[in-house]
Each structure stands twice: as structure tokens, then as C-alpha cells.
């Protein structure tokens, strides 16, 4: 008997891990109603504005910046995270930690659950520079469409846009991007980059 649906959900979810330490159930989660509404209708969630790509989830771990959100803590002066920057340490824990406390710290820091959380990171930029930064989570308004531009080639003009989310605000951003690509002489081909969608 369950009075709360979340209790029932938690009972169904397994917290068991494989022999390598990877959770067996990597895909089940819940959002509170307000949090889900803000995310699905407004594209707003707590974070730093850095989308992490987990290249390897087990040691040797590799976690890098896939892309950043405009006007976010990730791209603020002094932080300046860019695509390809590697995470080396989080809150004093090496990225390859195997302790439960270390893994919990990595998860809490990389994916903050609320606004105002501060975490210390050691990162390695793509030029090899290793540096320490502190990131504080904010309510990040996600850009559904990014990097819209025209690339001139000898065979014609190619329109490019990165489309990240199928959420309510995406429609207007897609229309704006298409209008931008259509300005002038238009384009001959279109690249719709949905690899992070």
C-alpha cells in the first residue's frame, strides 16, 4: 500500500549496480510538478549552463563540456568554459574516485538540483591549461536553438543550426532561426544539428 506515488515509484526503481559500479537503472527519475512545468514550458532548470558529455562513466572517467548556454555562469568572465574542456576534480574529489561519497559528490556538483548551489571544479581547457573555477547554479533559461549561421562554401551556402530541445519555446526560436537563414539570398542546404537533443 502506497499513499504517495513517489514512494511507489521508488519501490519499483532498482538502485543496484553492475560489477563495474554503473547503476542498472540509469533512466528512471522524477521531477516535481512545478520543476517539470518550468522545464517543459519555459525551458528553465537549475544548472550552470554547461551541458556535460559523459564520454566514460567509469574510471578512467571522461566528462567534458559538450556545449554552453549563452549568458550563463558557465560562460561568465573568469569561468569561460568552452566545448571540450575536461573536468578533472569536483569539490576536492578526483573525477576517477570510486568511493560512494566521491561519486555522490560528483553527481551533486555536476547536476545541481536547486538554484544557489556552489561547487569547486578543476578543469582542463582544450589548450591544456588546468585551472580551478567555482560554479554557482542559477535558473538557466535553455536556448532551444543555438549557433545559427550561414557557412559559405564553393558549392553554395549552407545553413547551420543546433537544435537542442523539443519544448514549448522551441517553436519561436526555430522560426527566428529559419528567418535568419532566409535573409539575403537564402541557403542551398541546411544542417540541422540534433546530436544533443
Question: Predicted segment positions?
Answer:
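Flexible, low-complexity junctional segments that flank or bridge functional domains
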Residues: 1-196
